[in-house]
From Swiss-Prot:
Full protein name: Trace amine-associated receptor 1
Binding of 2-phenylethylamine, residues: 103
Effect on the protein upon substituting residue 290 to A: Reduced activation of G(i) G alpha proteins in response to agonist-binding. Does not affect activation of G(s) G alpha proteins in response to agonist-binding
Result of altering residue 83 to A: Reduced activation of G(i) G alpha proteins in response to agonist-binding. Does not affect activation of G(s) G alpha proteins in response to agonist-binding
Entry function: Intracellular G-protein coupled receptor for trace amines, which recognizes endogenous amine-containing metabolites such as beta-phenylethylamine (beta-PEA), 3-iodothyronamine (T1AM), isoamylamine (IAA), cadaverine (CAD), cyclohexylamine (CHA), p-tyramine (p-TYR), trimethylamine (TMA), octopamine and tryptamine. Also functions as a receptor for various drugs and psychoactive substances, such as amphetamine and methamphetamine. Unresponsive to classical biogenic amines, such as epinephrine and histamine and only partially activated by dopamine and serotonin.
UniProt entry keywords in alphabetical sequence: Cell membrane, Disulfide bond, Endoplasmic reticulum, G-protein coupled receptor, Glycoprotein, Membrane, Receptor, Transducer, Transmembrane, Transmembrane helix
Gene that this polypeptide is encoded by: TAAR1
Cellular component aspect of the GO annotation: endomembrane system; endoplasmic reticulum membrane; plasma membrane
Impact upon substituting residue 184 to A: Abolished activation of G alpha proteins in response to agonist-binding
Lineage: Eukaryota, Metazoa, Chordata, Craniata, Vertebrata
Localization (cell): Endomembrane system; Endoplasmic reticulum membrane; Cell membrane
Species for this entry: Homo sapiens (Human)
Chain intervals for the UniProt region annotation (Extracellular Loop 2 (ECL2)): 175-186
Pfam family, one: 7tm_1
Known outcome of mutating residue 290 to N: Increased G-protein coupled receptor activity in response to Ro5256390 agonist-binding. Decreased G-protein coupled receptor activity in response to p-tyramine-binding
Transmembrane segments: 25-49, 60-81, 97-119, 140-161, 189-211, 250-273, 287-307
Amino acid sequence: MMPFCHNIINISCVKNNWSNDVRASLYSLMVLIILTTLVGNLIVIVSISHFKQLHTPTNWLIHSMATVDFLLGCLVMPYSMVRSAEHCWYFGEVFCKIHTSTDIMLSSASIFHLSFISIDRYYAVCDPLRYKAKMNILVICVMIFISWSVPAVFAFGMIFLELNFKGAEEIYYKHVHCRGGCSVFFSKISGVLTFMTSFYIPGSIMLCVYYRIYLIAKEQARLISDANQKLQIGLEMKNGISQSKERKAVKTLGIVMGVFLICWCPFFICTVMDPFLHYIIPPTLNDVLIWFGYLNSTFNPMVYAFFYPWFRKALKMMLFGKIFQKDSSRCKLFLELSS
């Protein structure tokens, strides 16, 4: 007999019949992903909050993005873990809507942050003289506000007003909806709208901005190499270090963006294509793609650990308890060049 999620069989979702060993393996893997996500992003949050040297416009955007990733690991992933391993939802229909809305909101907020970080890097690298004037604290606050508010309004509005299956109500209630389930369902219109809002438009902005940065950085490198070394050797040494630092930051943020696109691209492509293919994508594959997307929030702190020396030094100070020492917040995590 098939296992069911609800005691009223004719309206219940079907529970998976995986063995206990398979379930235990899945739970172990997903718990590892969740813990890695929480610990990694918490280190980023604490580092930027604690050390005054890290209180820069770019780092506040990174801090906000790490908060998004931390909340995804804290509020979304644990419930998704149970749903994925059991193929059942035990937390009620209202909380299903809250969970789905929060999931869409935080996933969308990540790429919004990355878009604004790319714009910040554009001015830092391509217009450094006016960077501090253009990317002041007010501008950063507006960017952070938009990164949180727009995804929140979009996600909660769409799910609680049930706009996500508008135009496909018959398919949803006849073939998808059942007691004990919490699947993410999109109609043709809502699928395209989600793809455009959460992925394509902000992702395209990022790609265009980083390509522009690449062209300008390449041109700057050519001009420096053509300059008279005897007359400008001192200037080159100072600017070379500064530009090397900026190029490294751009490279790091570019990798962060690339990881996001690689992780979320399969899910968003399936989201926009599935309604046009008459919903042929099985729920298990959809779960796999969702978790593959979640991995983006796990990988971001790892990118910082590999490419940012300040992250490694901050981590070392935390592990040895040095952040509890007096004036540890004023510790120099990296060398600052005087102007």
